[in-house]
Amino acid sequence: MLHLYNSLTRKKEPFVSLRPGKIGMYVCGITVYDHCHLGHARSMVAFDVMVRYLRSQGFDVTYVRNITDIDDKIIARASERGVSIDELTAQYIDAMNNDTHALNILPPDHEPRATGHIETIIRLIQRLLEKGNAYVSDNGDVCYEVDTFPEYGKLSHKDIEGLVSGSRVEIVKEKRSPLDFVLWKKAKPGEPSWPSPWGEGRPGWHIECSAMAMHELGEQFDIHGGGLDLQFPHHENEIAQSEAATGKPFANYWLHVGMLQVNGEKMAKSIGNFYTIADVLKEHHPEVIRYFLLSSHYRSPLNYSEENLLNAKKALIRLYQAVKDVPPQTADSKLDEYWQEQFNQAMNDDFNTPVALSVLFQLAHEVNKSNSPALAHTLKNLAGILGFLQKDPESFLQSGLAEEEKLVIEQLIAERLQARAERNWAKADQIRADLLSKGIELEDGATGTTWRRIAE
């Protein structure tokens, strides 16, 4: 049975969906004012694998991942660039789609944008005003009054009184409490705005996600996810406003992905230590990046380094070598039940991908010993749930080399062929050994000599 670590209760719990066989999942997406960095990729890959696994277990998953396309950062960046907000967001949405496609991240079933749900957001704010959980401030903003929700803090488990007394939140004189947050921002000159019962303005960030999640999945759904940095205040505020409006639990399970770090610090645009997905893709195969991102449990911090990416590359080479000579899978090919069960046990333990990867390596060892097509097909199928081992093995094993390097290898193969023809076995063996020392393995066959990279 699947068990998930629920941030709400701080423990692993058996997963029971609201509707048998069906799962509603909402994940906070990106704010499109810049290119996605590898920290975004970690979250997107983690939830992609969760969706793939749940579907492999027979669940009908409705996966929603939003796009924040109106925000202070977007407005500021568009102004800096001298472009319209629509131009800016379109550019970075296209870039995000290119990144996710390259990383083999499945598209969500629904990808709502905040600007497409203004009426839904306004209706939700009206409900909160009618119930007494929100107020119109002196400056025209509509704010949520945190003191009206006694359970505030139940997700992040923070000392709320300490936050207020320590002034660790922004003090705004128009708010009744420092913890109150804006639901609707009064329009400012030159900024985008929409008509509302409270005048022209635009939605606050927190209310956008609540409104879009409820629009796509209903007032209650199964799983809400995002990066650990969103737990407070974003997800805490989502719970407060959603449950105040409906009187029901918002999401049953809250999953949070640990931070990607560089030298022990969170990778973030605000710090300036981030690597864009596009830049990393220039240097590394997409499946290598996926493997690296899954090499640590999704809740744990993960350190970015070239060494860790190299280790991921070597690991994938070993897996690809195990399946390189396997005949194509046929309709009647059966998967090995024992290895499926071992893999499922790992994934049922809160999507434990490091253990799942160790199962794949044990299976690869068996494939190498037995050369069994059934085991090899099982290996490819299980790895496919993690989103890799899906390329042509020869293509992958020759990837990552410049064309000039490939030409040198082909030239050396030709020289070796000539040496063999001249019965100069010492030279032929030396060329093979030299290439092997550089991680290039030669294989002689009836149709000639082929080569592939191997794990050094």
Curated annotation (Swiss-Prot):
Its cofactor is Zn(2+). Binds 1 zinc ion per subunit. GO terms for molecular function: ATP binding; cysteine-tRNA ligase activity; zinc ion binding. Zn(2+) binds at C28, C209, H234, E238. ATP binds at K269. Belongs to the class-I aminoacyl-tRNA synthetase family. HAMAP family: Cys_tRNA_synth. This is Cysteine--tRNA ligase. It comes from Legionella pneumophila (strain Paris). The lineage of its organism: Bacteria, Pseudomonadati, Pseudomonadota, Gammaproteobacteria, Legionellales.
